[in-house]
A protein has these predicted regions:
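N-terminal secretory signal peptides that target proteins for export/translocation
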Residues: 1-6
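Extracytoplasmic ligand/sensor domains, especially the bilobed periplasmic-binding protein
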Residues: 100-113
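Residues that mark the start of a beta-strand
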Residues: 27-29, 108
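Periplasmic-binding protein-like
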Residues: 85-92, 110-113
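Extracytoplasmic "Venus flytrap"
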Residues: 31-56, 62-72, 92-95
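Boundary at the C-terminal end of the N-terminal hydrophobic targeting segment
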Residues: 23-25
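Bacterial N-terminal signal peptides
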Residues: 8-20
């Protein structure tokens, strides 16, 4: 009886978690900003592998590749924030200052550096 209860409880939690994640995924729009091309088989490639896994889980994702660590980064971040993205991942060390600057302008958008 005890094992049955535990199995039922765990199964219920798994189902609840699965449907909760699916419901959240439909509402979250994530963007990734890359320093290089996605086909570089290096830093950017690995980030894009992660992005594709997030997308496979049901989240809406977009990405911009080849963004220099300059004023262009700020411009791209503002465009992504203005286009309805809920979370923006900046994947290069040189994006730190542009990310911090733009994040102050968009308090309802999550920025991950």
């Amino acid at each position: 009886m005890h094992k049955f209860f535990i199995r039922s409880f765990v199964s219920s939690l798994v189902l609840l978690f699965t449907f909760t994640v699916a419901a959240i995924a439909k509402d979250v729009k994530a963007a990734f900003v890359y320093i290089g091309p996605t086909g570089d088989h290096g830093w950017t490639y690995q980030h894009d592998v992660g992005r594709k896994a997030v997308e496979a889980a049901g989240f809406k994702t977009t990405y911009v590749e080849g963004v220099p660590e300059s004023a262009d980064a700020e411009r791209v971040l503002r465009q992504l924030a203005n286009s309805g993205h809920d979370v923006i991942f900046t994947t290069s060390f040189g994006y730190m200052n542009p990310t911090n600057k733009v994040a102050k302008e968009f308090p309802n958008v999550k920025f991950e550096h």
